[in-house]
Amino acid sequence: GHGRSSIDSHFKLPIINTPIQKLYETDFKPFKNLCFSSYAMTAHVRYATIDKLPVTFSEKIIQEIIREYIGFKGLLITDDISMGALKGNLSKRAELALNAGCDLVLHCSGDISEMYKIARILPEFKSSFANKTIISNIRKDKKTININILRDEFKLMLHKY
């Protein structure tokens, strides 16, 4: 998370230099308690003692820490891929995030031309997307996600507010 940084990732990449053991002892613990959540979002921060890449692009952090150590098996969504913390064109950013193990790429600017650029690198979605687990074809660990269950949980979350 962003807890150890005062940098706003909308504009610049926060870099956290905390020793890895301290991160495991304190920072990652709360996430272990939330490992059964259906959804989670990556933070655009860099843990310098773990990887040179931001979390969103780091296969090491996503696979070894989020998926294995924390035990998160749900849908992993990027924070807004167009934020200033990340470098490179949007298509490359989306590709790096998916290759690292994110399931969905979030794009929030509303710029349709940017959306088209990102969509070009994504796998083709069939009309039966809601009934199939297309995300499992993207995922590195190939575990199936039940899209229908996630959709129903999302609807319930919307009705809470």
Q: What kind of feature is each model-predicted range?
A:
Residues 159-161:
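N-terminal hydrophobic targeting/anchoring segments and the immediately downstream early-domain regions
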Residues 2-129, 133-144, 149, 156-157:
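Second-shell residues forming the walls of enzyme active-site clefts
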